[in-house]
Amino acid sequence: LGVKNIVCIPHLGASTPESEENCARMAAAQLRDYLETGTIRNSVNMPEIVLSGQPEGCRILLIHGNVPNMVSSISAAISREGININNMINKSLKEMAVTVMELSQVPTEELIAELSAQPGIIKVRYWR
């Protein structure tokens, strides 16, 4: 480019067969982690949440708007069912948030439906 004090280098990305294979492995591992535990890594539109193993009871993941009183309304619905929240993570990225709760027991389908119907909640998932 001929610009003083600038050294241009190419962005290689996944431009070699080896790097393409490595990127595919990494993407597959990240998808597996999300499906098995709820871990979110390297997302451009979700906060990073790293979870390990399986909880003793049940793990529930909620994707929702990053708005006031959301976590309170979620935990109120869960407590009305007599379910204890053993552990909780809530992280946000701009206007989106993710809440992961480890519950003392598996939620009923009615509770999942109630949570899914709350304004601002985009997705509800749980693992046993």
What are these regions (language model features)?
Residues 1-54, 65, 98, 128:
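Rossmann-like dinucleotide-binding domain for NAD(H)/NADP(H)
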Residues 41-128:
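A conserved regulatory-domain signal marking ACT and ACT-like small-molecule sensing domains
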